[in-house]
């Protein structure tokens, strides 16, 4: 059983799944631009049917990988696995005809802010892929903070990605008075935690009314914390 590993510059990521096998037979093709790879895979194992009977099965799957970051953009089975790249655009279709069925794989790309379920049940592999597809930014870093609290198995990898994001923020401010921490920019979401005068924080963004600042703080142990504070508590 083969595997699939993504390499780019000094970064690598194992994209394999333990319940699938990977055989390169020439059917996995890059898109016209070279940005995506349409990869064919097989699922193997025993599947339990409605009557309680377990049967061994092989099932074909296809996944599109973004070759710029290793993101598995979409993962599916069925008829769409027979689709191929057409023309000179990154379009998957049943044929090159004008009325051919097209598969909108890009709409399936994982986005953390679109996840409505509890984060605790998400597999570590899926979270690692989510980070590759939708890395921490000012739009989603607060959601990643919540994920780190709710999913203990993936806490380490999520906090690492948050730390990497914060390291790229150049705007730094200093706490001037005791600063209570809030999960959202309003008084109803106050936590028991706080920062003390002299603490250094990285400024992520300011609320529209300028009364709150979204900050990132890295404690003495190197663990990141994302929170909201009142603007007047910072220098």
Model-derived features with residue positions:
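Residue-level detector of Asp-centered blade-edge/turn motifs that repeat once per structural unit
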Residues: 32-33
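Short consensus segments that form the blades of beta-propeller domains
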Residues: 1, 48-57, 192, 204
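Acidic, small-residue rich beta-repeat scaffolds with periodic aromatic anchors
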Residues: 55-175
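Short glycine/acidic-enriched loop and turn motifs that connect beta-strands
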Residues: 43-49, 98-103
